[in-house]
Amino acid sequence: MSFVIPSLKLSISSTLTCALVLFTSISGHAQSSSKLDKIVIAGWGKPITEITNLLVEEDKGFFKSKSIEMTIIPGAGGADAIRNLLSGQADVAFTDPASFFTAIDKGEKLRAIYDIYPQNIFNLVSLKSQNITKPSDLKGKRIGVYSLASGTRQNLQILLHQAGLTEADVTIVVTGLLNFLPLMQGQVDATAATDTGLLVGKQKGLGDVNVMEVKNYVNISSDFFVVREETYQQKKDVLKRFLQAYQDSAEWMIRSPQEAAKLAVKFALDGQNESANLEVIKLRNATSVSAMTQQKGLGAFDMGLIQKGVNAYKGFGLIQRDIKVADVISQDLLPGKK
């Protein structure tokens, strides 16, 4: 599996090569691994520890075992992943629901096929000294976001909406992925982040903080796998195998967090500390499961909860149209579906 970073020209591993002919049972028929179907994932970020299950393909071969050659293109947020998908650079986007539904609202023909993280991982963090404890306290504040195309920005909008505020009532500061350094240096009053980002920030010396978790307001999922409608219609067999491989990799990381933490040292850009990796992986494993996945398996969507989230998006102006999630989310490609 290659991790293509055009700007840095960094390769995490060598491209998969054809192996001996092996046959694996996929949906009742054999697939030859001597002929690999290529799937390019448009990522929301860089090759970091929380996606270790995708980074270990060279060692574990989850995708190759399903006759898939998997490559990842990094991005600068979920909207960036959608852009890379729409431009044809990728087959699948790893993106947040807000970016997905915003694209749908604009008329793009897309379909979500797997709920990667059914728990909302986003939060807003501020130093205790700022006394920011509720959304209304954000008025007039400088707030950091990973990028203007990121889920941190969209989820900040959810919090602002709770207090009847908009982005016009605050100052948005783009901080990049290391968004806790500007907070610690006083360049921003608060920063929109994720659970793993907060964990890493604390490991790097972030002091006492107040945390507002978005899930306490709208617990919509954090990330989906999204494809173009034409890809969904034309490549269902390949996508089924891709989702089975991803589910296998996610189940492995849940089952073997210590092994994943060790491999992250080798494959993740931020994975130098194995014990820190383990904490990140445990957090991400916890957000991969929900009451719905307990019943129907990893990747299953809670359609009712997601519809509530979409209605909230319309309520604060992120989208303009009424969107029925059943029209743009399909579960027929999930592992176990016929």
Predicted regions located by residue number:
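Pocket-lining segment of extracytoplasmic ligand-binding domains
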Residues: A98, L178-N273
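Short, low-complexity disordered leader/linker segments with a strong preference
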Residues: M1-K38, K337-K338
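Short linear loop/turn motifs
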Residues: T71, N277-A286, I323-P335
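Predominant activation on well-ordered alpha-helical scaffold segments within soluble catalytic domains
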Residues: L55, F101, Q157, L199-K202, ...
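Secondary-structure end/capping motifs
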Residues: Q234-L318
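Short, glycine-/small- and polar/acidic-enriched structural segments
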Residues: S32-Q185, D189-D195, L206, V211-M212, ...
